């Protein structure tokens, strides 16, 4: 819907605020008020999430869930856009000398990405691991039954993991109604104290993923960190290079302590 203004211009009905601001200007404290309103938004969202009940709470959580998924997708798309491609957009028509040929093509990102994929494709079993045998963990010890159901609480299909876990940055929770395995935030670890056996140094490195949990394939899928688990860590800080001169980014390590007792993850690098 549009309306005709005095000058003969068409204007949408929802643009009257912009028209008023063009004619009369803004309040002197307009920018400050906008800044404060935006700063209060997160507090308002938190208050609604904690205090809404019933159908309103359900609809609000669905809305927030969809917003978070879209935000994660936007962030991921932005990060992928920032990575340089290995091939140039158009081949240059002007001839270049030999020593300048490699400057026009950004191959580092592609090489690192390929190296990481190759590393992940390898089997962890090919390494001589420091802990060849570990004690088994029963499902009763690993999972705590969470009773659900309106009023009666008779349903017992949900499980809470009682051991430390690793959850990737791209993980998006399912709606609460369909979430079978709950991984508490207090038991999630992102870094490990990794010891290099040859260099004799211990460094705190970010965990990239769980390669294999010796207890159960399900525990591997859930990212459970127990003694003897093979994890992949980011070793770019150590400055390791391959024989061809490429930077080593991801490397496997085995957890040597009991994280749920110690409150930290200690591991030995597999070299």
Curated annotation (Swiss-Prot):
It is found in: Nucleus, Nucleolus. GO terms for cellular component: nucleolus; preribosome, large subunit precursor. Component of the pre-66S ribosomal particle. Interacts with nop7 and rrp1. Interacts with rsa4 (via WD repeats). The lineage of its organism: Eukaryota, Fungi, Dikarya, Ascomycota, Pezizomycotina. This is Ribosome biogenesis protein nsa2. Pfam families: Ribosomal_S8e (PF01201). Residues 61-75 have a biased composition (Basic residues). Involved in the biogenesis of the 60S ribosomal subunit. May play a part in the quality control of pre-60S particles. Residues 22-97 are annotated as: Disordered. It comes from the Eukaryota. Residues 22-46 have a biased composition (Basic and acidic residues). A motif (Nuclear localization signal 2) lies at residues 62-69. Keywords: Nucleus, Ribonucleoprotein, Ribosome biogenesis, rRNA processing. A motif (Nuclear localization signal 1) lies at residues 25-32. GO terms for biological process: maturation of 5.8S rRNA from tricistronic rRNA transcript (SSU-rRNA, 5.8S rRNA, LSU-rRNA); maturation of LSU-rRNA from tricistronic rRNA transcript (SSU-rRNA, 5.8S rRNA, LSU-rRNA). The gene is nsa2. Belongs to the eukaryotic ribosomal protein eS8 family. Ribosome biogenesis protein NSA2 subfamily. InterPro entries: NSA2_fam, Ribosomal_Se8/biogenesis_NSA2.
